């Protein structure tokens, strides 16, 4: 960038005119030219100072270049400063509730699940039927199973880059929670903000959209490891229209007239024309790492495996592995 600005400044430097000893160039109008412009030959004398005009113009360009450079440097400092701040401190549920909107806005706290202050590292709830409330699932990593960048390497889960905003946490999930006499637990999801649209990018540049969800989850097992399956809805609804106006419940049936058969591409055309909004299935494993019976709070970690978007049946879904932390209240 500095080289480009220097070249531009060099190009805009005033040219030296050796033909005239003075810096002013006097242009005398011709009688014919003067009449055509409505000027008298005796009074039509135009004087311009090329040197001073070009000098002023070059000075303005130089000032503009300095301002642009300062703006770029300031932007770099702001970006580096924002990255240096990192994730905010994880707060307890009561601490989050005590903050105002302006204290939470722009800090990243709204996308975090609460934590527990104190408590026990074992699950200390008595046997019985409870109600699970305020369940929160916060992903900390997204990996996608795809072909490796290196040759002759089998497909494996690869780290990704998040392309969407910090709005991927599931919250306010509730449902019946049961503790058996043998210490086992069972949870069934019934309501809450139980899905979030997320897009990640693979190292090769491919972007993978999917719905992070725990809809209709039914998990059971021991507190240190209880798992279950859940429903993964279609990323797009049946009324969504593709760029050619085709949809599941509305729009055109085909892109252009009726496709001719017998060419061996019927299946490919069918995938593009016949939109499939059927839901798929995912699986999640949860672990309780700390509990606090006096407040009814539990926290833990989870690992979920679910399919990605299929573009309404036109693409083969990829396996998405999501790891993170979770929080809940048991009453």
From Swiss-Prot:
Residues 1-57, 58-84 form a transit peptide. One of its GO terms (biological process) is photosynthesis, light reaction. Coiled coil: none annotated. GO terms for cellular component: chloroplast; chloroplast stroma; chloroplast thylakoid; chloroplast thylakoid membrane; cytosol; photosystem II oxygen evolving complex; plastoglobule; thylakoid. It is found in: Plastid, Chloroplast thylakoid membrane. InterPro entries: OMP/PagP_b-brl (IPR011250), PsbO (IPR002628). Keywords: Chloroplast, Manganese, Membrane, Photosynthesis, Photosystem II, Plastid, Thylakoid, Transit peptide. GO terms for molecular function: mRNA binding; oxygen evolving activity; poly(U) RNA binding. It is a peripheral membrane protein. Stabilizes the manganese cluster which is the primary site of water splitting. Regulates dephosphorylation and turnover of the PSII reaction center D1 protein. Belongs to the PsbO family. PANTHER family: OXYGEN-EVOLVING ENHANCER PROTEIN 1-2, CHLOROPLASTIC. This is Oxygen-evolving enhancer protein 1-2, chloroplastic. It comes from Arabidopsis thaliana (Mouse-ear cress). The gene is PSBO2.
